[in-house]
Amino acid sequence: MTTFFQQHFSRNKWLAYAQLMRFDKPIGTLLLLYPTLWALFAAAGGMPPLSVLVIFVLGVIVMRAAGCVINDYADRHIDGEVKRTSQRPLATGRVTTTEAKILFVLLLCIAFVLDLLLNRYTFLLSFVAVALAIIYPFMKRFTHLPQVVLGMAFGWAIPMAYGAVSESLPLECWLLFFANIFWTVAYDTQYAMVDRDDDLRIGVKSTAILFAQYDNKIIALLQFITLVLLVIFGWISQYHWGYFVVLGLSASLFSHQCWLTKQRVREQCFKAFLNNHYFGLGVFFAILVGIYA
């Protein structure tokens, strides 16, 4: 029994589990959290019910962790071939495949319990979220557009939030959802540019490879479409003009990102990717201004 606990629950093992769930890298959680907050506050026309807000924040943390576990499980044979991912717990053997599968199921069970605390409408929508989380990691083997599936996975909290608050999916919901997809494809392409050379060598597909020398131009186009959809969203929602001012200020971050990725240097592309959480926060502030000003 002592040996069992030493193997599976030692301090080093807990650290490995935390790294597998990316608790040491909160950027992904933030990129998932901000669109969720957009939708919750937009659907409620202000502060959503506190219980719903807490459930969704916890759900974001849990599902982000689950997504990382299943992603690393799917990539366990190729992560060791990529410089950026070579030290991940599954790639180095610090976490076994059995442990990863058990952890994934445990996280899904926690998410299931959280879903039970919401209305039936949202509970049914949650099955799509689970399906997208499971499908996404395997898409890079079959298509150059896995980032689109990631955008759907990261954005599905938006219809769930509308469902939880209003039990409806109005046009505003879908404008936010598709804005999030275009934004996600843009920032995850920046992320994929970091690994492009390694991905080409091992045969992994991504939008960074698909877009090739047009990558920066297409990223800029995707960001422009994101802004157009967010402007339409604010107009239909009849937000105060302050929303558009804050959104415009947030959009200036895209110009900075384009400058960072201009030379396609790995470190600079990664900085551009990280910069996106400020945009997500900016849009959240814009929505608050639009509602309360």
UniProtKB/Swiss-Prot annotation:
Keywords: Cell inner membrane, Cell membrane, Magnesium, Membrane, Transferase, Transmembrane, Transmembrane helix, Ubiquinone biosynthesis
GO biological process per UniProt: ubiquinone biosynthetic process
Chain ranges passing through the membrane: 26-48, 98-118, 122-142, 145-165, 167-187, 218-238, 241-261, 272-292
GO molecular function: 4-hydroxybenzoate polyprenyltransferase activity
Needed cofactors: Mg(2+)
Subcellular location: Cell inner membrane
CDD domains attached to this UniProt entry: PT_UbiA_COQ2
Chief location of this protein within or outside the cell: membrane
Pfam families registered for this protein in UniProt: UbiA
Origin: domain of life: Bacteria
Pathway(s) it belongs to: Cofactor biosynthesis; ubiquinone biosynthesis
Membrane topology type: Multi-pass membrane protein
Signal peptide limits: none
Reaction(s) catalysed (UniProt annotation): all-trans-octaprenyl diphosphate + 4-hydroxybenzoate = 4-hydroxy-3-(all-trans-octaprenyl)benzoate + diphosphate
GO cellular component, one term: plasma membrane
Assigned EC number: 2.5.1.39
Family affiliation: Belongs to the UbiA prenyltransferase family.
Role according to the record: Catalyzes the prenylation of para-hydroxybenzoate (PHB) with an all-trans polyprenyl group. Mediates the second step in the final reaction sequence of ubiquinone-8 (UQ-8) biosynthesis, which is the condensation of the polyisoprenoid side chain with PHB, generating the first membrane-bound Q intermediate 3-octaprenyl-4-hydroxybenzoate.
PANTHER family found in the cross-reference section: 4-HYDROXYBENZOATE POLYPRENYLTRANSFERASE, MITOCHONDRIAL, PRENYLTRANSFERASES
Protein name: 4-hydroxybenzoate octaprenyltransferase
